[in-house]
Amino acid sequence: MNLCQKFTPKYAIIFFTMKLFKIYTYKDEVLHQKATEVSLPISEEERNRLLDRVEYLKKSQDDDFANEHGIRSGVGIAAPQIGVSKRRFAIYFEDSNGKKYEYGLVNPKIVSSSVKRAYLSTGEGCLSVPKDVPGYVYRYYRITLKAFDVVSNKDVTLHLSGYPAIVFQHEYDHLDGVLYIDKINKKDPFYKDPEAVAI
C-alpha cells in the first residue's frame, strides 16, 4: 500500500469548503527546514485549520472527489507541505484490519522506537513529490508518539507498529525538513535489509 496515488501537478490546488491551498513540492525551501513548535494552547482558528486538513484527507480518498478536483489520494499531510513551517500534521486512513486513524497532531514527539525496522514493499509516495521515486525507505517498525490531538481535543500517547508507524514517521519527517526520497539508498534503491520487515 502506497502513501499516495495518482499524479499531481507541481502546485496542486486543494478544494475544501470554499477554501484553497496549494501543496508545495520538494523543490521548495519550506520542505527542507526544521519546523517550529506551535504555541499552546492552540487557537480555535489553528485547530479548525488542522481539522480541515483531516477532512481533506477523507475527501481525497473518495475517487469521485479526487477525480473531480484532479488531486492525489493521501493518508497524511504536514504543515510544511502547505507552506507553513509549524510542527503539526493531519492523518486519516484505515489499516488492513479496518482500524481508523484520524488525528490532527500538534507538536508531536517520538518518545521511543524499536530496534526492528520496516519498509513498504511497494515503496513510499508523497503529495510533495509529484512523481513517485522508487526504492525502499527503512523506518522503525514500532514507535510511541506523544502530541496534542485536535480531533479528540486532548493530549494523546499513540503506540504504533507496522504500516501506521510508517505513515506517522513519514509525516513526522516533514517537520524536520526530511523527505522520503532523502532516505532511499542512492546506490542501491532496492537493497533488502534481511533484518527488516516488509509491509
Language model feature labels by segment:
Residues 7-199:
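Positively charged
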